[in-house]
Amino acid sequence: ITCPQVTQSLAPCVPYLISG
């Protein structure tokens, strides 16, 4: 799983995963 930016937790990653 790759996220644009992971800071502290997966909070910024959640909308990214939903988007695809």
Curated annotation (Swiss-Prot):
The keyword 4Fe-4S does not apply. Stable between pH 4 and 10. One of its GO terms (biological process) is defense response to fungus. One of its GO terms (molecular function) is lipid binding. Thermostable. Retains antifungal activity between 4 degrees Celsius and 60 degrees Celsius. Activity reduced after 30 minutes at 80 degrees Celsius. Belongs to the plant LTP family. Homodimer. Plant non-specific lipid-transfer proteins transfer phospholipids as well as galactolipids across membranes. May play a role in wax or cutin deposition in the cell walls of expanding epidermal cells and certain secretory tissues. Binds 1-pyrenedodecanoic fatty acid. Has antifungal activity against P.digitatum (IC(50)=7.5 uM), A.alternata (IC(50)=1.5 uM), R.stolonifer (IC(50)=8.44 uM) and M.grisea (IC(50)=2.19 uM). Has no antibacterial activity. This is Non-specific lipid-transfer protein PHP. It comes from Peganum harmala (Syrian rue).
